[in-house]
Structures are given as C-alpha cells and as structure tokens.
C-alpha cells in the first residue's frame, strides 16, 4: 500500500513510536497492521554487522521454518532416470533435463526453487545467468545440488528457505503469513535467528544483529529487539 494511503497511515498508528518490541509482541503487532483482501506475507529485514565485500564475512545458508512459510512453493528438479522418478514422487512441480534448460532459456522462471543432481550441473550451467541473479541457481551449500532429491524436494516444500546477505549487509526472509498465529511467526523467527547466529562469521566484529524489523507486504515496519536471542515466544519482561 502507498505510504500516503489512509490504510497505511492507520496501520502505522498501531505501532508505538520509539518502542522496540520483543519478538512475540512484534508478531502480534505486525498481524494488526495487515490490511489487505488477501493473506499478506510477513517478512523480516535484518541489518548484519558484517562486511559482505570480504569473502570471510559472507552470510548465507538455509533453515527449515518449523511452521512453514504458508506459501505454495513451486520446485523444479534437473534430474533423469530414477532420480527424476523420485523427484516426481516427492512432489516436484517440473522435472526434466535438456528440455527444462531450453524452457528456462526461453524466459520461463515461474518457480521458487531449483534442485539438481550433480550429473546435471553442466546442463544447468547453461542457464546460470538466468537463475543466478534470481537466487535460483542450485548450490551444494544450500543442499540444492544433491543425489537425495526426495529429501531436498520435501524440505523445500515443507518450509525450508534460503537466506543470503546482500551488498549492503541486509538480509531479507519470509516468516509466514499474516494468518499465522503470533506464536507460529515467533517460532519461525527464532529458527532463523538461531541459524544466523550459528553461521556467524568468525571475522565479524562488533554487534552482529544490528537492526531487525518485521512487516507485512507493503506495510509499515515493526522494530524488533535484536538483543533477544532465546525464548522468542516469551513476553517482554
């Protein structure tokens, strides 16, 4: 919604100016700011205390959100033979090899995640310039280049998300839908924060979680207390 719209201003009024919310309170508040005829997505934006220009301070990885994302995730798999059959049985939306590459070369990118078996990566490389900028390129580090396609498909369909810090040291991720309970959103938030702390670069100095906000699609940002790194569903003391 436009920041000048009545709906946006009404949503903004529900956020206490100057308050930094405990995670559970932030989730309750962000649900109150939802204003839409559809079920908007709840996103988190995190400013990290890292220098992404340095290779030893890149932050990226995956995490399985305990309550899923609430979104129907479309998954494509580059595989053939038994692996292709396994991918289809696991629920992959599109499975293929050369023909899938050609389809993507033709401009098709109507999917949310891509998985490939190692033997197909040479073919996938032909569309790296299409998939890479969109964050869709299969990568061993995120578990999307694998021989266990069944596990990979089920994890992504079940709520596994990828995250990566951008050039400005910001990281964005989905936490769920506004229809989720505040507890479900806080649990998903906690899973992400726990994983971010686990993969914190040893070279990072100073405060790691510098700023955290949550918001619904096109809605105002709710500040989250970045010092809370446990008991995410607990009320502020």
From Swiss-Prot:
Coiled-coil residue windows: none
UniProt cross-references to CDD domains, sorted A to Z: Ribosomal_L1
InterPro entries (UniProt xref): Ribosom_uL1_bac-type, Ribosomal_uL1, Ribosomal_uL1-like, Ribosomal_uL1/biogenesis, Ribosomal_uL1_3-a/b-sand, Ribosomal_uL1_CS
GO annotation terms (biological process): regulation of translation; translation
Job description of the protein: Binds directly to 23S rRNA. The L1 stalk is quite mobile in the ribosome, and is involved in E site tRNA release.
Subunit text: Part of the 50S ribosomal subunit.
Name of this protein: Large ribosomal subunit protein uL1
Gene name, Swiss-Prot/TrEMBL: rplA
